[in-house]
UniProtKB/Swiss-Prot annotation:
Signal peptide: none annotated. Keywords: Cytoplasm, Ribosome biogenesis. InterPro entries: Ribosome_maturation_RimP, RimP_C, RimP_C_sf, RimP_N, RimP_N_sf. It holds the Pfam family RimP_N. It comes from Acidithiobacillus ferrooxidans (strain ATCC 53993 / BNL-5-31). Belongs to the RimP family. Required for maturation of 30S ribosomal subunits. This is Ribosome maturation factor RimP. The gene is rimP.
Length: 153
């Protein structure tokens, strides 16, 4: 997967906002010869994303993408909610989902570990705090390659 360039990401966030939603994540995904721009949105912390929200963001983004033309070549636009295993992208996300189970992949090794799973304890002194059976872990946001919620069934 290729991360969407910052300029494109900011434009997508702005267009999602115009349509009444917040951008959670955006990425370019290549499968064989096909390329998709995947956009994940949310409404707010208490309102679920509807198909109408996805359609509104898709329409707004399509207009903007046609005018700005930031992506060269053919691609498919996909707009959806982030799902139960949503990515955690910023300190606000880690604080918001305090008490939830999360999986964190680090850029490098921390005490011999690159991947950790446990309960999010939130953010303390600009550091993300996670607790699992092995103990309490703290990370700077820059140490994290990717993180996501782990749904509990």
């Amino acid at each position: 997967m290729v991360n969407v360039e910052d300029r494109l990401y900011e434009g997508i966030a702005q267009q999602a906002g115009i349509a009444g939603c917040t951008l959670v994540d955006a990425r370019m995904v290549r499968t064989g010869r096909a390329v998709a721009l995947q956009v994940f949105i949310e409404k707010d912390e208490t309102t679920a994303v509807t198909i109408e929200d996805c359609a509104a963001v898709s329409r707004q983004l399509s207009l903007w993408l046609d005018v700005e033309n930031p992506i060269h070549g053919a691609y498919r636009l996909e707009v959806s909610s982030p799902g139960l295993d949503r990515p955690l992208k910023n300190l606000h996300d880690f604080e918001r989902f305090k008490g939830s189970q999360a999986e964190i992949h680090l850029h490098g090794l921390t005490q011999g570990r690159r991947r950790l799973q446990g309960e999010l304890l939130g953010v303390e002194d600009q550091k993300i705090v996670l607790k699992n059976a092995e103990g309490r872990w703290t990370f700077a946001l820059d140490d994290i390659h990717k993180a996501r919620l782990v749904p509990q069934w």
